[in-house]
Design a protein with these regions (language model features):
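Pyridoxal 5′-phosphate
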Residues: 1-215
Length: 215
């Protein structure tokens, strides 16, 4: 309660827009992201908190497809959370470049990871059945054929140990309102593997996508 009062009366009430720099708001997406990173096996500085999970799915997929310009297939499974599939379909329509969302049964994911696939979009834990995909094996299979991976951690982050670094995941997204106990309205997050940072650019970048928003 004391922190909230300070934020409302001092940081927002007095600093107003200068609070972005003077109160440290500008760095909170990364500083909070570092706390999430410890729970999902990610490197400090490579998880950013903000927006919604659906937006983060869009951003991760857009980056992955841009990194594989010669491939047109997004591979997912019928047990995936519906909004992930909706975002993939929306991105495909926006790109209008002949991409395909290929949806297979959960147990058939591995055998369908072929050289046609640009990126796999998989929710680690099925929200209906609790089925858990083997992140390490599926990521290795994807990399063996030159594909990238986007993992949705909505039903795993905070529920059990996740090891993005150990599994070699390329991208991961998640939310903080479920097993991270952020509550209603709390933001999503995105992870980009360090090896990809120099080869990706933010999709849907806005005011905070500028290197110096107040310049």
């Amino acid at each position: 309660a004391q922190k909230v009062t300070q934020m409302m009366e001092s940081e927002w009430g007095e600093m107003l827009i200068t609070g972005w720099n003077n109160a440290g708001w500008m760095h909170q997406p990364v500083s909070v992201g570092d706390r999430v990173a410890r729970l999902i096996g990610a490197e400090p500085g490579h998880v950013v908190v903000g927006d919604t999970l659906s937006i983060k799915v869009y951003q991760a997929l857009a980056s992955a497809l841009e990194m594989r310009p010669d491939r047109r297939v997004i591979l997912s499974d019928s047990g995936n959370f519906p909004s992930d599939l909706y975002m993939a379909e929306g991105l495909i329509k926006s790109l209008n470049a002949g991409h395909e969302l290929r949806v297979v049964a959960p147990e058939d994911i591995a055998e369908n990871i072929t050289e046609e696939v640009a990126v796999t979009l998989i929710t680690e834990v099925d929200y209906r059945t609790g089925r858990r995909h083997d992140m390490g094996k599926l990521t290795a299979k994807a990399h063996a054929v030159g594909a990238l991976t986007v993992w949705d951690l909505a039903h795993s982050a905070g529920a059990f140990e996740v090891d993005l670094m150990g599994c070699g995941a390329d991208f991961a997204v998640g939310c903080t309102y479920k097993y991270l106990n952020g509550g209603p309205g709390s933001p999503g997050f995105i992870y980009v593997a360090p090896r990809h940072v120099e080869h990706t650019r933010p999709a849907l970048s806005g005011w905070l996508g500028h290197a110096a928003p107040f310049a």
